Design a protein with these regions (language model features):
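Post-J-domain flank of DnaJ/Hsp40 co-chaperones
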Residues: 1-35, 66, 180-183
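Intrinsically disordered, low-complexity linker/assembly segments
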Residues: 40-183
Length: 183
């Protein structure tokens, strides 16, 4: 049983990234100070799909107080900031989409913005109930180790359309009366 190899102390820093950075990966600049007071700058490649709280270790960029010992490591703790429209669930993303109840009844296609800023045409089937969650395969986060990509889950929120003209209200009332007379 050999003695453990001694080395200089590790240094830990925290980097805050966005959910978009998780989706696509990002190079960031990490700035930190060693015990000696030396200011260090490191170019850090944050991998795609990294988890909140995960620590990335970079060997040999830590403390160097004792020159006779190997340099310590740099431990980079990742904090993923909350996103206004998307929530992460492992490899999956979750979002909400407000659709008026007439479109839910009749069916429609709605353009929704993806995490990357693109547009996705989301098919709303006829008779969809508010609160239904639609799954869009392949629009989640990709795990770089496995190549697996999660889904985008869209929760449909029903909203009442703005009926400010008397004619519109009368048409909806007539439809309501007709549907109620059938049941």
């Amino acid at each position: 049983q050999g003695r453990p190899i001694r080395q200089n102390a590790d240094v830990t820093i925290t980097i805050r990234i966005s959910l978009e950075d998780v989706m696509f990966g990002k190079n960031v600049i990490g700035r930190y100070t060693l015990r000696s007071g030396e200011e260090c700058v490191a170019n850090l490649a944050i991998p795609q799909g990294i988890e909140n709280g995960q620590v990335v270790q970079i060997r040999g960029l830590g403390d160097n107080t004792h020159p006779q010992l190997p340099r310590g490591n740099l431990n980079v703790q990742i904090i993923v900031l909350a996103h206004a429209d998307f929530e992460r669930d492992r490899l999956h993303l979750r979002t909400k989409c407000s659709i008026n109840v007439l479109e839910l009844m009749l069916g429609d296609t709605k353009n929704i913005t993806t995490l990357g800023g693109g547009t996705l045409a989301l098919k709303i089937p006829k008779g969809l109930n508010p609160g239904t969650i639609l799954s869009v395969p392949g629009y989640g986060i990709t795990d770089v180790r496995t190549g697996q990509t999660g889904n985008l889950y869209v929760e449909v929120k029903g909203i009442t359309p703005d009926l400010d003209r008397y004619e519109d209200i009368a048409k909806v009332q007539a439809l309501y009366d007709e549907l109620n007379s059938r049941s």
